[in-house]
């Protein structure tokens, strides 16, 4: 891990310019805030991290808050930049694909990457936050302040006013830079949206989520194959399960609030599960299912879009404070961590010139952030419904085939989002031209149509790729036939 450094010395950026360390106030000590503290602390800046809750390292887990996260390439890079990637991967559980459960209990495996076998990692939220805070605490120039709730701010002057939720003591602070990492209901963003002509939208979906748990088997093992994200897609609703280090599974039920509200007693709950998730009753356990379902209420899901992310040369929002998204692409944390990487790159480029760093961050990130917010919303439709349709499975086979033949040119959407650092907006642009090609092929439904892909791809591939395409396409056509469920 990177070692702590003395913030009293001048720092040098990648352009060779020396600069005095900044006083930075980070509001929000969750995942993104604590990682940003490490990024800026490593560069020698004086960082004060303010969190309204008590220290998560000594607090009990909050009911209703997901303890699972899917770590992929963008998040891994941001962790690697502060020397923590290996520690988190060693603790995480690799998931190589989705395992789909039908209503009869039969399962089908859909790999994330059938060609190169890349995977995402299930990591515990609390563990990850603890690792980040422990690492931050080792820097003498990073200072952690818990039970500090922001109540007002003068973002033009860099002044903050906070209150201790327990003692009600009022505290103030001043900083050269204020960064809001305080989540979807950001107090820093509330100050920013007061500005005239500020773009802001907030969208709640009609679905909520409620968490359940699958315990280990009597022998202390996982109750299901643990290297997969398990999904029970049911059209208008779905259930997913991610593995934990203690051999339990965090199960999340997503469905319309009207449906949650219609399940008012034990009998209705068990009837609902017998009809839609019969195999899950045995996995969860009847008594545990009833207890966990009724002990808490379904939680809302919100998408936030706004721009710009900065105010002058004094304030910035990142992570969920800037672009909260529904959790169906597993990119919320990864996008927030990527914010840290992008911001650090700008510090490397411009030193401490916040008048250049902050506007450029806003300009670089807003389009990509809006793109992944929209993509996450669409992916809910895919996960709960489309994954069971033959047209979707055929499309995925075509994606895999072309990715195998042209790995540097044809990259499936999921791969570009989860396993690369391509801009989110570019990922969607690539998908658009791929869709045009595949639509022609799917409507053609013949070997000749598949062979025609070579011509349609001409503008996107080199002659070497075309040569491989023409020699392999006929021999691999059998891959396009949909397979029966296992």
UniProtKB/Swiss-Prot annotation:
Protein name per its UniProtKB record: Kynurenine 3-monooxygenase
GO molecular function: FAD binding; kynurenine 3-monooxygenase activity
Cofactor(s), by name: FAD
Pathway: Cofactor biosynthesis; NAD(+) biosynthesis; quinolinate from L-kynurenine: step 1/3
GO CC terms of this entry: mitochondrial outer membrane
Gene3D superfamilies in alphabetical order: FAD/NAD(P)-binding domain
SUPFAM superfamilies in alphabetical order: FAD/NAD(P)-binding domain
């Amino acid at each position: 891990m990177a070692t702590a450094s003395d913030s009293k010395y001048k720092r040098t950026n990648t352009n060779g310019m020396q600069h005095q360390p900044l006083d930075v106030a980070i509001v929000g000590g969750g995942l993104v805030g604590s990682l940003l503290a490490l990024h800026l602390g490593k560069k020698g800046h004086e960082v004060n991290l303010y969190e309204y809750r008590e220290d998560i390292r000594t607090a009990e887990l909050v009911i209703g808050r997901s303890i699972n996260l899917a770590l992929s390439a963008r998040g891994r890079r941001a962790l690697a930049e502060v020397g923590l990637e290996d520690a988190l991967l060693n603790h995480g559980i690799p998931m190589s694909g989705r395992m789909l459960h039908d209503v009869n209990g039969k399962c089908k495996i859909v790999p994330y990457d059938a060609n190169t076998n890349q995977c995402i990692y299930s990591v515990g939220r609390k563990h990850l936050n603890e690792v980040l805070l422990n690492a931050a605490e080792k820097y003498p120039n990073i200072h952690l302040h818990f039970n500090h709730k922001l109540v007002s701010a003068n973002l033009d002057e860099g002044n903050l006013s906070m209150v201790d939720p327990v003692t009600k003591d009022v505290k103030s602070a001043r900083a050269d830079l204020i960064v809001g990492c305080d989540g979807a209901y950001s107090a820093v963003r509330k100050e920013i949206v007061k500005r005239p002509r500020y773009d802001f939208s907030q969208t709640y979906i009609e679905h909520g989520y409620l968490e359940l748990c699958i315990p280990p088997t009597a022998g202390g093992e996982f109750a299901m194959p643990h290297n997969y994200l398990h999904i029970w897609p049911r059209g208008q609703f779905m259930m997913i399960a991610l593995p934990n280090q203690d051999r339990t599974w965090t199960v999340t039920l997503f469905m319309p609030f009207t449906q949650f509200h219609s399940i008012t007693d034990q009998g209705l709950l068990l009837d609902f599960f017998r009809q839609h998730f019969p195999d899950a009753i045995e996995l969860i356990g009847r008594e545990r299912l009833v207890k966990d379902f009724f002990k808490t209420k379904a939680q809302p899901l919100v998408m936030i879009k706004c721009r710009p992310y900065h105010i002058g040369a004094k304030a910035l929002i990142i992570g969920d404070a800037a672009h909260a998204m529904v959790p169906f692409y597993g990119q919320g944390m990864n996008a927030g961590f990527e914010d840290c990487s992008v911001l650090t790159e700008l510090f490397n480029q411009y030193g401490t010139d916040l008048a250049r760093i902050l506007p450029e961050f806003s300009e670089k990130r807003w389009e990509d952030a809006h793109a992944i917010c929209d993509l996450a919303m669409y992916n809910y439709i895919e996960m709960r419904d489309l994954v069971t349709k033959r047209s979707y499975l055929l499309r995925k086979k075509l994606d895999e085939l072309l990715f195998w033949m042209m790995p540097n040119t044809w990259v499936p959407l999921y791969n570009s989002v989860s396993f690369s650092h391509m801009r989110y907006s570019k990922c969607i642009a690539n998908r658009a031209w791929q869709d045009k090609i595949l639509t022609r092929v799917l409507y053609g439904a013949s070997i000749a149509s598949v062979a025609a892909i070579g011509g349609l791809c001409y503008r996107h591939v080199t002659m070497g790729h075309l040569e491989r395409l023409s020699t392999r396409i006929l021999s691999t056509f059998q891959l396009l036939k949909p397979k029966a469920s296992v």
